[in-house]
């Protein structure tokens, strides 16, 4: 664990942006009697399919009674960190050029201000990988269509419910295996000569029976067999985050179990659509797939340096009834 902790890295670049401040605070800004909230994106520009950190420092922190937001259609779960509020979010794999976060700051007395902040998005390389799999996993028979649809809906519901779970983790995330990465996130997979999908996770080498560990504290949301994913474990870490451990040979946890960071949860296998034994590790923020290796470097409590943002454009907002 000590070695894993030494591997944690926090990006040093920080991007400050404030585009629009709307509402009573904005009106005060226009009259020169209040300062704008300061915002920080980490990283300053993001790859498609990445996890990002958004921090906001309100003009008057002790007057804030609530803060809500959304990015790419997924809610943001802000938490106070000193006089700031911070939240993780996700950039869709199909995003182009930029994404926009919308944040509502609720103040005392019922007043609220809305801030809109864009984040630059960079294209993720998508190399192609040719693989051979059993024909039934490339073009499943019609008789399995209902099963595949039901399983897709089940996994989607697990991801959605993670937004209803409070954040359960406090330690840094760790890798599920101390092994080489053999498959990268975002690769285009060509099975039996047919383009089937993007690779929405990271593969780790491992012989059948090798240990697989939980990458952080959470509640086991699913244990079972899925057509494409084989024997799988999904862990709800709360605040929108879910991790999955696929193609296992066996599992050591049950739905509803609370697992600790680094706890043994299963063993490497070759179940589902695979070309050989390995672990497929995935991470999702709500319904958005992100590179799970981004979890290793995320730190909600990392010290950030705020500076003055650009001048805000303001207009009068909704007044309390």
Predicted regions and their residues:
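Non-catalytic extracellular/periplasmic "stalk"
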Residues: 32-185
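N-terminal secretory signal peptides that target proteins for export/translocation
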Residues: 1-9
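Bacterial N-terminal signal peptides
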Residues: 11-24
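Sec/Tat signal peptide C-region and signal peptidase I cleavage site
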Residues: 26-30
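Short polybasic linear motifs
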Residues: 3, 14, 319
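Catalytic cores of peptidoglycan-degrading enzymes
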Residues: 174-317, 321
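Acidic, Ala/Val/Gly-enriched low-complexity intrinsically disordered segments
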Residues: 9-10, 316
